Design a protein with these regions (language model features):
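Short, acidic/polar
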Residues: 1-6, 46, 90-102
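Glycoside hydrolase catalytic-domain groove-lining segments
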Residues: 2-81
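Generic secretory/membrane-interface signal
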Residues: 10-12, 59, 95, 113, ...
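Short loop/turn motifs at secondary-structure junctions
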Residues: 11, 107-108
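Broad hydrophobic/π-residue packing in well-ordered secondary structure
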Residues: 18-20, 66, 95, 112-116, ...
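A short acidic, glycine-rich active-site loop
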Residues: 37-38, 83-92
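Aromatic-rich peripheral "rim/lid" segments of glycoside hydrolase catalytic domains that contact
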Residues: 78-81, 91, 102-107, 113-177
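Surface-exposed, glycine/proline- and aromatic-rich loop segments on solvent-exposed faces
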Residues: 180
């Protein structure tokens, strides 16, 4: 991208990447990544990868997607424990904060958490044969590691959804917010 010459292009150029802590698998095996430890003495392959990625560009970089799914199934395991699945929602929140801090510490131009709300249309190799493709968007599949990334979920209840996004907060009474 740096080699594209632009005239009268005030905004400039930037690079964007999807950077997840569990993929590519080399994050679990690359020696220098495994030797990268944070201030708490924990292995941090994510920040090592971010630093390496910066070497490919002289323009600003935005992490256009980063996240962790809370699916029951697991597609990739991370040496950091930041797995693609088998993570509870509290851990997901803590991991998102940590990944964003890594992005900031690496002096990236920004990061965008994936995703605001769960996407039910996603599928994965481990269960694609067990769903009906044209009906996939209509039901959540907790097994699918490409779902359950959302900060906001739309979980079905026994007879109705458990929470309506309609401005009436009475269905959330007694729920302690994560942040205010």
């Amino acid at each position: 991208v740096e080699n594209i010459k632009c005239r009268n292009f005030g905004p400039g150029m930037f690079a964007s990447y999807h950077v997840y802590p569990y993929y590519p698998d080399s994050l679990n095996y690359q020696k220098d990544y495994l030797e990268n430890v944070d201030e708490n003495g924990k292995i941090n392959t994510y920040s090592a990868y971010l630093e390496d990625l910066k070497l490919a560009h002289t323009i600003p970089i935005i992490v256009a997607e980063f996240g962790i799914p809370t699916s029951r199934g697991m597609g990739h395991e991370s040496v950091m424990g930041y797995n693609q699945g088998k993570v509870d929602e509290n851990a997901q929140g803590e991991m998102l904060v940590h990944m964003f801090q890594c992005i900031k510490d690496a002096k990236y131009a920004g990061g965008i958490a994936f995703t605001w709300q769960d996407e039910w249309f996603k599928r994965t190799w481990n269960n694609v044969m067990f769903d009906i493709a044209d009906r996939r968007p209509f039901w959540s599949n907790i097994q699918t590691t490409e779902q359950c990334f959302g900060l906001l979920s739309f979980d079905p209840g026994k007879f109705d959804v458990t929470c309506h996004v309609d401005g009436d907060v009475s269905d959330r009474e007694g729920v302690v917010p994560i942040i205010q």
